[in-house]
Amino acid sequence: MALVKMKRLELVGLNRERKQVLEYLQSLGCVDISDSRCEEVGTAQTAAAISRFDAYISQIMRALEILPPAADGGGMFRRKTNAAGVAYTADEGEISRTVGIAADIIRLAKEKKERTDELSALDVREKTLEPFRSLDVPPALRKTRRTVIRLGTIEGEHTAEELFGEFADGGAADVYIEVISATKQQTALWILYPDYLENEAAAVCTRLNLLAPKGLGAESVAEQLGKIAARREEIARQNSDTNEKLSALAAERGALELMLDRLSVRRDKYRVLSGLGITKTAFFLTGYVPEELADKLSDGLMQKFTLSVQLSDPEEGEDVPSAFDNNALVSPVEGITSDYAMPSPHDIDPNPIMAIFYYFFFGMMFSDAGYGIVMMIGCGLLGFGNFLEPEKRRTFKMFFYCGVSTTFWGIMYGSFFGDMIATVSRTFGKGQLALLPVLVDPVQKPLSVLIMSVAFGVVHILTGMAIKMYMTWRDGNRFAAICDTGFWIAVILGICALAGGSALGSAVLANAGKIIAAAAAIGLVLTQGRDKKNPVMKLFGGILSLYDITSIVGDVLSYSRLMALGLATGVIASVINVLGSLGGGGIFGFIVFVAISVFGHSLNFAINMLGAYVHTNRLQYVEFYQKFYEGGGRKFSPFGFKTKYYKF
């Protein structure tokens, strides 16, 4: 269980076999090809082709998003189609035809969207016109030779008599008012008055907050509403035709998916081609291959092609890609590490050690046997069954093992869906059954669980520091390993011995802890300022280094979340059981209990599982990896068939 050892591959071949060599390497999928360009040799001009493939791929992806889902539902549970016997290359005719289909799908969807936008605009216009439906004069008419016409709406429901009084009070009694429509929300008005009353009437209209509609047009309102209805019917027919065409084109989904993968494979090949060194007759390729595959790869290349292959160990400082090689228990958590950072060539593989703590801490925070069994069943089926692609199963395998740990800690804490066994026994039976804790009841003894959590945190931190000490020692800096890490380990162990001796009443252990911690602290004072030239600054730097103990204490206290989340899971689960039992015994009470339990425990499961996942990751990233893990490496990404729908 370690990082995969890599071999550097250098290959020189003939240009006439270049295409075949690249396709052979792509079919094997075991070589991470590096950029081999240099000033002394030329390169292939592939930028235009790559850009064209990118455009085709983008177009096909947009078309697939538009089409209805695949018959198998797609999504996480869709497996790649085995394309054995199907060529992964396509001629220009096939590409042109398939991209044309994608373009038709996009065009139809665009036209449909434009019509949908038009419908929205028609709805707005109809809403504006509807209050004036019964208006029998052109709405655009605003003035005659001696009169002024105002058209608009005011808030609330009003009568012509009420409004006439408003105008009369405003000095514009010589006015004609027609209420076109009235609802509780608004009243639509048509107002006519002599032009010599413009100022007075305008003031009243302003006071009433008369809002004039915009863009009513020259035709009558009834004619405009009729045209809107006719246009809406026409759009419905056009959308129906478009939907039929899109449904017919849905039969091309398989062809589009196949072409998408074909173009992706071809684009990847052109990207690799752009990084090769090329002369008039030959090409040069470099990369990295796992050591266990190197000889087999070299023999295969030499047998099939006329070329030269050289394998060598990478030199110090090379950008060697990293890959993990772990067993079935450890490999599921590799994604946790790669999400943080891939290891550099200087790092060790942290996964074997991290996996132990990861499963342990997750279970301690989720800590319910019922929830753990649910996780084991669900994630076990998805992780070890044949429902998903192999690369999709890894996360579910990780949560399966987390479920095992959760079940273990649930038994230790006496929690099975909280206190469901005791609640069911008490509500529907004689109250004689209960799951007793094997180790400790966190509700009754939270302090004991807190001490245990902090103790596990100390072990976690010391493990990280021990790894750092080992790596420094391995690199030949033995003095630094002892002074920079060893002394701190001794300080922590001494403090732990002091605390343990005081708690247990053991003066010998407490005194030993004092001596160890004090001696290690003196060692830190004498060595942590060794990079300074001034003796006073050396001493001051050493004394100042002791302030780092506050950071270590903060790290240790952060493990209190192991107690807090574990306690929260059990307490909330028990509260849900209490709520469910309020219906009492009998059939009705049982139905109420089941309904509340299913809903409540599902919610509690989701929330606390997410919390356990997030905080377990945090403990690894912040408290553990920062003690020794440098990262900064590059993930091994072999040149191969990176497809979405088909396996070539």
Regions found by a protein language model. Give the residues of each.
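Long, charged N-terminal accessory/stalk domains
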Residues: M1-M354, E389-F396
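Conserved, carboxylate-rich catalytic/transport cores that coordinate ions
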Residues: A2-R8, K19-L22, Q26-I33, D295-F648
